[in-house]
Swiss-Prot record:
Mg(2+) 2 binds at E745, N747. In the N-terminal section; belongs to the MurCDEF family. This is Bifunctional enzyme MurC/Ddl. GO terms for cellular component: cytoplasm. Its cofactor is Mg(2+); Mn(2+). One of its GO terms (molecular function) is ATP binding. Cell wall formation. InterPro entries: ATP-grasp, ATP_grasp_subdomain_1, D-Ala_lig_Van_CS, D_ala_D_ala, Dala_Dala_lig_C, Dala_Dala_lig_N, Mur-like_cat_sf, Mur_ligase_C. Residues 1-446 are annotated as: UDP-N-acetylmuramate--alanine ligase. It comes from Chlamydia trachomatis serovar D (strain ATCC VR-885 / DSM 19411 / UW-3/Cx). ATP binds at residues 111-117, 600-655. Pathway: Cell wall biogenesis; peptidoglycan biosynthesis. Its EC number is 6.3.2.8, 6.3.2.4.
């Protein structure tokens, strides 16, 4: 190409066209272009010297200019017709791309999904390796640039959608995958699409890397493969996602590349990173450059790009518009955010795509909690008659989520009324839904009104209040407003603005003042220990009045606080428990001597007598003879209707494990710790440092072997899963000198005072106090949402039954 040539782009603001315009401008060519609107993409080009025309007019075509068009430009476009009639050279953007890349080592990326991410990753690797590549990519980097001219290499996307990949003969290539996308351009025949990809691979001069996990590609392509399948040339051995980052280990040519970190999310991006890595290794790029590029990758705009400034909720924008892309994106977000409510705002892109994929779209939203469906963005297609209500119903049915049709012009207002603290909003689509995030950039949702309930009728009243005071110190004022409800030892309620001003007096929970203040609360934090607070009673009350609450759910509270039931259930499932013998009040009253004889025969003194429903150090008695045994059992039955005797584990380590989350989904097991007393059994006073006693020592760096620690953590994980744990829990074990361990008991609402190890366990894991509270609130809200969905469904069923 001659230096004096002038290039004019019809539709210069398009993502593919603007990339080539950047390359030409960097190489010193004169560039002009037209488009129907002027945005940030055009502004970047103008800053480089491009001339811009708003709208399409014949007179925009410069004399002697090469005129560039894309497949989206109509042959009836006035500028296209003018260029033809004047005799200007008119080229498709694919032809120009091929020309621009011909004097460099070209690396072209094609496939139904992932082209932009793979080409961006390859570009980042080459830049990290100081190779200064040229690039033309279908997405903007964080600087708003999608094209540029360099030296040795040229990285570009090759658009498979319109068949224009026939123009390319790259040195290296990547085929990411194949899906039923853009089939209308291939006479509705997926085999024609596959044939075009096969031809592209055959024309690759050196190496074609393709997805070895894709059967349709594997059946007809030759080249190097990447994927999870063990037969792949670049074999992904393992991967996991931690927050907003991926880690994977891969093997290529007998070399294992362990724990590669990528600043992306989702299994699909593991494959994308593997494809980029395969190209880089083929080019002889140093492993360090690959790792550094992946670790520092800043991403691509409109690929889970954060749009809002508020710290109390998250608004992400994503380009996903095909069912496969939507599913992968939402699954990645779910893994990153755990139990936070995900609101998916979906704008279908093109009537033809919706029609072609109508059977796949309804099931693509399974990882969302709620879907807002708006009108199709036509992208120039003729409008078709669509029943959005029926599509919303299909999404609700197949993805098991609430889906509502919201007209596009009402989306902003609806979201401003619906978004709450901790929500994650994800806009999905390739159309003008891009504007939604900008409109909500500075939006702030209302704070959540938390109601902390503490005190209670239990003998652990004092610890409950201390725990509540400690939690109150760490509540984020930007997230929450707080009210306090102190339950007296007599069971009366007092509503106060501060626990420091609380008096030991109160009213019935049915008193209008208490009821009205409870009504204003959005989420309740019950920080209660023992009966009437930790055993499901309070949880049942809160569900009855329709309030979300943190911590354990009804069933889990009731089960975990019943030590006999927990032991019996866990023992049946293979978890070792300390040998025990349950007693009933009726049986004990009628046949005390018989039970005493049975106990003495089964156990050796000292023996422990325990109440089944109280805390770990409440209603527990160490006895050394039959007289003490009888008295202790009588005393225990004064505190609880269910009592058991237990073989002693004196001399064993007391090991505790803290857990937060949903046992049927996402939960976190913190590292274990040891509670050491002054000797023998750790009673209530020593546990909390009361009555002049020194607190039991908490040891986090225990001298247990790594193997034993892992076994205990695995057991805690298993116990929480099997019991379908909800909210929070502390799981206690005994461990002897040989490394044998037994489940002791579970505490669904552990102490949360300044010295309580439950909170410290998560602090040592890298959490903040605020994060712990956030997690408790998020878990409670998510559980409430799930229950509300079931309630509303039952009402619908009843309505249909009545009709």
């Amino acid at each position: 190409m001659m230096k004096s040539l002038f290039y004019h782009f019809i539709g210069i603001g398009g993502i593919g066209m603007s990339a080539l315009a950047h390359v030409l401008l960097d190489r010193g060519y004169s560039v002009s272009g037209s488009d129907l609107s002027e945005g940030k993409v055009v502004e970047k080009l103008k800053n480089k010297g491009a001339e811009f025309f708003l709208g399409n007019q014949e007179e925009h075509i410069p004399e002697g200019a090469v005129v560039v068009y894309s497949s989206s430009i109509s042959k009836k476009n006035p500028e296209f017709l003018s260029a033809k009639s004047r005799g200007n050279r008119v080229v498709h953007r694919a032809e120009l791309l091929a020309e621009l890349a011909q004097d460099q080592i070209s690396i072209f990326v094609t496939g139904s999904h992932g082209k932009t991410t793979v080409s961006s990753l390859i570009t980042a690797i080459l830049q990290e390796a100081k190779k200064n590549p040229s690039f033309a990519i279908g997405g903007l980097n964080q600087e708003g640039i999608n094209g540029g001219s360099g030296s040795e290499y040229f990285v570009a996307e090759a658009d498979e959608s319109d068949g224009s990949i026939r123009c390319y003969t790259p040195e290296f290539s990547v085929i990411t995958n194949i899906d039923d996308e853009h089939l209308s351009n291939f006479e509705g025949d997926r085999e024609l699409l596959l044939a075009s990809l096969k031809d592209f691979a055959l024309k690759t001069q050196q190496i074609c890397w393709y997805n070895g996990d894709c059967p349709r590609l594997r059946s007809c392509l030759q080249g190097h493969t990447f994927g999870l399948d063990s037969s792949c040339d670049l074999h992904i051995l393992s991967y996991y996602q931690e927050g907003w980052r991926l880690y994977f280990t891969a093997k290529y040519q007998d070399v294992v590349y362990a724990d590669i970190e990528v600043q992306l999310v989702g299994m699909h991006n593991v494959l994308n990173a593997a494809a980029a890595m395969g190209i880089a290794l083929s080019l002889g790029i140093d492993e360090g450059a690959i790792r550094n590029a992946f670790r520092g990758f800043s991403g691509v705009q409109r690929r889970l790009q954060r749009k809002n400034s508020s710290e109390t909720f998250l608004f992400l924008e994503d380009y996903a518009h095909h069912p496969s892309e939507i599913s992968c994106t939402l699954r990645a977000v779910r893994t990153a955010v755990g139990q936070r409510r995900i609101l998916a705002i979906y704008q279908p892109h093109r009537f033809s795509r919706l029609r072609e994929c109508i059977d796949s779209f309804p099931s693509a939203f399974k990882d969302a909690d709620e879907v807002l469906l708006t009108e199709v963005y036509s992208a120039g297609e003729e409008a078709e008659d669509i029943s959005y209500q029926k599509l919303a119903e299909a999404i609700s049915q197949e993805s098991i989520v609430k889906c509502t049709h919201i007209p596009f012009h009402e989306l902003q207002r609806h979201l401003e009324q619906s978004i709450r603290v901790h929500d994650v909003c994800v806009s999905l689509g390739a159309g003008n839904i891009v504007n939604l995030g900008e409109k909500l950039r500075d939006f702030e949702p209302q704070k959540l009104h938390l109601g902390i309930i503490c005190g209670g009728k239990s003998c652990e009243h004092e610890i409950s209040v201390l725990s509540a005071k400690n939690i109150a110190k760490h509540l984020s004022k930007s997230f929450y407003d707080v009210s306090y409800f102190l339950i007296t030892r007599e069971g009366l309620w007092e509503s106060v603005s501060s626990l420091e001003t609380a008096e030991d007096s109160g009213k019935s929970v049915f008193d209008p003042e208490i009821a009205q203040r409870l009504e204003k609360v959005d989420v309740v934090l019950p920080i209660l220990h023992g009966p009437y607070g930790e055993d499901g009673a309070m949880q049942g009350f809160l569900e009855t009045i329709g309030k979300p609450y943190t911590g354990p759910a009804i069933a889990f509270s009731a089960i975990a606080m019943n030590k006999v039931f927990t032991k019996r259930f866990m023992s049946d499932l293979g978890i070792p428990v300390v040998p025990y013998l349950p007693l009933t009040l009726a049986g004990w009253k009628q046949e005390q001597d018989k039970w005493l004889a049975h106990i003495v025969e089964a156990f050796s003194f000292p023996i422990f007598v325990k109440s089944s429903h109280l805390g770990s150090s409440i209603g527990v008695f160490e006895v050394h003879n039959v007289i003490e045994l009888r008295d202790a059992i009588n005393e225990a039955f004064m505190r609880d209707n269910d009592v058991f005797v237990e073989e002693n584990r004196l001399g064993c380590k007391e090991i505790e494990v803290s857990v937060l989350g949903d046992g049927s989904g996402a939960f976190v097991v913190a590292g274990l710790h040891e509670r050491r007393g002054s000797g023998g059994f750790i009673d209530y006073q020593e546990k909390y440092g009361l009555s002049g006693k020194s607190s039991a020592q908490i040891v986090f760096d225990t001298d247990l072997s790594k193997e034993i620690q892992e076994q205990i953590l695995e057991a805690a994980d298993k116990i929480y899963r099997l019991l379908l744990g909800k909210g929070s829990c502390r799981i206690d074990f005994f461990v002897d000198e040989e490394g044998n361990f037994w489940l002791s008991e579970m505490n669904p609402i552990p102490g949360m005072t300044e010295t309580s190890p439950f909170l410290t366990s998560f602090i040592r894991k890298g959490w903040s106090y605020e994060q712990i509270v956030h997690q408790l609130v998020i878990d409670g809200l998510q559980r409430f949402n799930q229950r509300q969905r079931l309630i509303s469904t039952s009402f619908v069923d009843q309505a249909f039954a009545i009709q």
